[in-house]
A protein has these predicted regions:
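N-terminal nucleotide-binding beta1-loop-alpha1 segment
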Residues: 1-25
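Conserved alpha/beta core of the MobA/IspD/sugar-nucleotide pyrophosphorylase nucleotidyltransferase superfamily
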Residues: 3-8, 158-240
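Conserved beta-loop-beta/alpha segment of the NTase-like Rossmann-fold superfamily
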Residues: 63-64, 71-138
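Conserved core of the sugar-phosphate nucleotidyltransferase
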Residues: 109-185
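ATP-binding glycine-rich loop module of kinase domains
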Residues: 233-264, 298-307
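Short beta-strand micro-motifs within the conserved protein kinase catalytic domain, predominantly
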Residues: 275-286
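Conserved kinase catalytic-core helix
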Residues: 299-358, 382-403
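Catalytic activation segment of kinase domains across protein kinase-like and atypical kinase folds
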Residues: 408-415
Length: 415
């Protein structure tokens, strides 16, 4: 592809305190719906750039470990010698860059790709002024005034910088940063001051976007999780004003079973599920409308978080409590083995058959599986063992209690 860009992602600071439930993480490795921010940025730019430079300082080691599979000629981590403001971070990153440049803040995901736009440009949005964002005035592409996180003095909406910029002349932009360092303005980041200077020589297109997902502020982060989740799962729609999730599924038998499981829970263990507002178990069009939770899943905590040992003990104690609480409700029946075999054997083998059809799992069925240096049987061999062992284990069982049939990390949310 012609006209490939360079991408700079400033990621020098950790997320604010209100987002540190997962630990003190930089925005670039903060999770949003089973991925981290960089996963989205990489997918967006990988076909449009020669390199992506991630500029780190706080918790740089965590970024290096988490992004290690990505590191290559195209993806590089650079560590600041000392922490300065945003302008100093960008200045350090610029080095001798001469080709067209994209600057994308590490906590900003915009689904519109600025690399597809010609010329100097940046994304913006309109909102009422607050001390959360950096706003601006512009005329004919020239930024005439910047309001850098200033309290509101007007009830009118103004344009704000989203956090994605395209610079066609990075050599001159570096000169603009040097001027901004000399003309210190306490109320404005040197980056925005330099951008203002740059726009006088190179007018910039201010492009409005509605596809902006911000993970650097608590309120916007949870709103972004809502919208990104709805985009990624075409059977989910979310009413963010009411906090209601509506779900459908092509796998109707499994989905109807899930709905019935929700509905049949005894009232004093309903705390484990969202409130249900509407549903249908009709085979024609099954659906459920339920309360949407924006909590992190245990999957996110395990893969992307930085929890202490005690925090993990607390998480598993809560899971154990739920499992023990379920044991209060039992069914005793001498002919229960068929239902148990359906749950523990048939369901497992059905899942294996689905996996076998997916290319990424197919080799696991024929070849030994190696995990952390230990080798295990191929899944075909494990299936054969299960078919013999599980029925024998169930012969003497005549009591069954409530269980969750898919209690995996991705299905457990922790507040």
């Amino acid at each position: 592809m012609d006209n490939l860009k360079r991408v700079i992602i400033p990621a020098a600071k950790i997320v604010p305190a209100e987002l540190q439930k997962l630990g003190k993480l930089p925005g670039i490795i903060y999770p949003i719906n089973q991925k981290i921010a960089f996963d989205y940025l990489y997918e967006e730019y990988k076909e449009y750039c020669t390199s992506m430079d991630i500029i780190c300082f706080e918790q740089a080691g965590k970024v290096q470990r988490r992004l290690n599979p990505y590191l290559s000629e195209q993806v590089r981590i650079k560590i600041l010698p000392e922490l300065g403001d945003l302008g100093q971070t960008i200045y350090f990153a610029l080095g001798q860059i001469k080709e067209s440049l994209i600057i994308n803040f590490s906590d900003t995901i915009v689904m519109d790709n600025i690399a597809k736009i010609d010329g100097d440009a940046f994304f913006c949005q309109e909102d009422y002024m607050s001390d959360t964002w950096t706003y601006f005035d512009e005329q004919d592409g020239v930024i005439t005034r910047v309001y850098d996180k200033k309290p509101a003095k007007t009830d009118k909406k103004k344009k704000l910088f989203v956090g994605v910029f395209q610079i066609e002349d990075p050599v001159y932009f570096k000169t603009c940063l040097e001027k901004a360092f000399q003309e210190v303005r306490p109320q404005m980041s040197t980056f925005y001051h330099a951008l203002q200077i740059y726009s006088r020589q190179h007018p910039m297109k201010a492009i409005s976007t509605e596809n902006w997902f911000d993970i650097g502020h608590e309120d916007k982060y949870y709103n972004s999780k809502l919208e990104v989740r709805a985009r990624e799962f075409n059977h989910i729609s979310i009413d963010k004003n009411r906090g209601i999730l509506r779900k459908t599924s092509d796998d109707k038998d499994k989905f109807i079973g899930e709905i019935k499981w929700y509905l049949k829970l005894p009232s004093d263990v309903e705390y484990v599920r969202p409130r249900i507002f509407d549903y249908s178990t009709s085979y024609v069009n099954p659906y459920v409308s339920m309360e949407y939770y924006a909590y992190h899943t245990v999957h996110e905590l395990f893969l992307y978080g930085d929890l202490t040992l005690q925090q993990w003990v607390d998480v598993f104690n809560r899971i154990r409590f739920v499992c023990d609480d379920f044991k209060r409700y039992t069914v005793k029946d001498g002919s229960i083995q068929h239902a148990l075999e359906e749950m523990y054997l048939t369901k497992t083998l059905q899942r294996f058959e689905r996996m076998k059809k997916e290319n990424i799992f197919s080799t696991f069925f024929e070849e030994p599986i190696e995990v952390n240096g230990e080798k295990y049987l191929p899944l075909n061999d494990i299936s054969a063992v299960l078919e013999k062992v599980i029925p024998k284990m169930l012969y003497e069982v005549d009591t069954f209690n409530i269980i969750h049939g898919d209690l995996c990390f991705a299905n457990i949310m922790v507040d």
